[in-house]
Amino acid sequence: MPELPEVETVRRGLLPVLQGAVIESAEARRPDLRWPLPEGFAERLTGRRVEAVGRRAKYLLADLDGGEVLIVHLGMSGSIRIEGAQVKGRPAGFYHPRGEPGTHDHVVFHLAGGATVTFNDPRRFGAMLLVPYDQLDSHPLLSSLGPEPLGNTFHADYLAQACAGRRTNLKAALLDQKVVAGLGNIYVSEALHRAGLSPRRMASTLASASGAPNVRTERLVTAIRDVLREAIQAGGSSLKDHRQVNGELGYFQHNFKVYDREGEPCPTLRCKGHVQRIVQAGRSTFFCATCQR
C-alpha cells in the first residue's frame, strides 16, 4: 500500500496540472471501487475548478470551487497518471502518452486544455469520495488522524506524550494512524533502524515517568523525518504498483537499509549483525537485533 512518500509524490506530480484546472468532464467507468462512487459523481465534478491539491496522511485532497472536496485513496494498487499536459519547466516527454485505455482505468478526468487525469486500480481497493469542505475535518476517514510527521506539531514532546503508558510495541504504535499519520510498514522499519531502536521495544519507553521525551524520542523523530524526506525526494518506493504520475518508478527502494533485506549484513558502521525478519500483527518487520535495542 502506498505510504506517505508515495502519496506526496503523486500530489506533487498532480499539482502543476490539476491545481487551477477546470474539469470539463468526468468518466466513472467502474463505480464499484472499495466503496461505491458518490451519487452523481461525474455530474458533480463536471465544470468544477480545482482550487488546491493537498494531502492528509495517505489521502489526496482536491478542493473544488463548488464547496466540495474530492478525497482519493490509492488503496493497495491504485495509481494516477497524467497525459496530454504541457507543464512549464518540464521536459516535453515528462508526461507520457499511453495509447488505448487500460482495463483498470476506472475514473478519468478530462481537463480544459486537453490533459487527462486517470485513476487506475487493478485490485479496486482504492476510493474516491466527495465531501463538503466544511465537513472535511469531521469526516470519519480524517477526524481521528494523528499529526503529520513532517509538520510542526510532530515533535519529541508530542511523541513522548502519545506513547506514555502505551502497552504495545514501538512498531505498532508508529503504525497507529491516531498516533502519527501516514507511516506504514516500509518507513517504520527504516526509521527504527536509523534510530537504533528495536521494533519490539515497548512504546512507553519513549517517555519518562513524567511523560517527558528522552534521547530515544529525539532520535526517532529525527529518523522519521529524514527517511520520509529522502523517500519523497526519490519519488517514493516502487515495489509492486507505485508509479509517479508520469509513469516513472520511484527509486527509494534502492536505498533501503533493512526493509526486504532479510539475511543481509546490517549496513550500520561497525555492526556485525544481520537483518532479520519477524512478523508482528501479521506484517513483516525487518530489523537488526544487534544494533537496534
Swiss-Prot record:
Cofactor(s), by name: Zn(2+)
Active site: which residues? P2, E3, K58, R283
Q: Which reaction does it catalyse?
A: Hydrolysis of DNA containing ring-opened 7-methylguanine residues, releasing 2,6-diamino-4-hydroxy-5-(N-methyl)formamidopyrimidine; 2'-deoxyribonucleotide-(2'-deoxyribose 5'-phosphate)-2'-deoxyribonucleotide-DNA = a 3'-end 2'-deoxyribonucleotide-(2,3-dehydro-2,3-deoxyribose 5'-phosphate)-DNA + a 5'-end 5'-phospho-2'-deoxyribonucleoside-DNA + H(+)
Q: Which CDD domains has this protein been placed in?
A: EcFpg-like_N
**The record's free-text note on cofactor binding:** Binds 1 zinc ion per subunit.
SMART domains the record matches: Fapy_DNA_glyco (SM00898), H2TH (SM01232)
**GO MF:** 8-oxo-7,8-dihydroguanine DNA N-glycosylase activity; class I DNA-(apurinic or apyrimidinic site) endonuclease activity; damaged DNA binding; zinc ion binding
EC number, as in UniProt: 3.2.2.23, 4.2.99.18
* Top-level taxon in the UniProt lineage: Bacteria
Tell me the protein family, please: Belongs to the FPG family.
Q: How does it assemble?
A: Monomer.
Q: What does this protein do?
A: Involved in base excision repair of DNA damaged by oxidation or by mutagenic agents. Acts as a DNA glycosylase that recognizes and removes damaged bases. Has a preference for oxidized purines, such as 7,8-dihydro-8-oxoguanine (8-oxoG). Has AP (apurinic/apyrimidinic) lyase activity and introduces nicks in the DNA strand. Cleaves the DNA backbone by beta-delta elimination to generate a single-strand break at the site of the removed base with both 3'- and 5'-phosphates.
Report what the protein is called: Formamidopyrimidine-DNA glycosylase
